[in-house]
Regions:
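Short, low-order "capping/linker" segments at domain edges
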Residues: 84-90
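Short, well-ordered beta-strand segments in beta-rich or mixed alpha/beta enzyme
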Residues: 1-8, 34-63
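Short, surface-exposed ligand-recognition loops at beta-strand->loop->(often short) alpha-helix junctions
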Residues: 7-18
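An amphipathic, aromatic/His-enriched active-site/gating alpha helix that lines ligand/cofactor pockets
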Residues: 16-35, 53-84
């Protein structure tokens, strides 16, 4: 699992790219899906939980086609990433 947050110029524009071109690219790098959250305190902040291992994520962010895709989606900042450190049963 990978948790990422970023700020975007326009959520609808970002979501259009995230759910199409970016989804295809993520799948190519092993992503099995994602959950998207909007921040209630910052209208331009998006949080995403990816069903993705660290190697797949690293492969994705190292792909030279990704930075132009992020720019096209309207990212205002570079995504900040946290990796799942553990999972508890309750």
């Amino acid at each position: 699992m990978v948790l990422a947050t970023t700020t975007v110029e326009d959520f609808d524009r970002w979501m259009k790219v995230f759910s199409s071109t970016s989804a295809d690219k993520r799948k190519h790098h092993g992503s099995k899906g994602s959950l998207v959250f909007r921040d209630p305190n910052e209208a331009d902040r998006v949080w995403v939980i990816f069903d993705w291992d660290a190697e797949g994520w690293q492969s994705f962010v190292s792909d030279p086609e990704v930075p132009p895709m992020l720019k096209n989606a309207g990212h205002k900042s570079k995504p900040q990433v946290l990796t799942l450190a553990g999972e508890l049963g309750s």
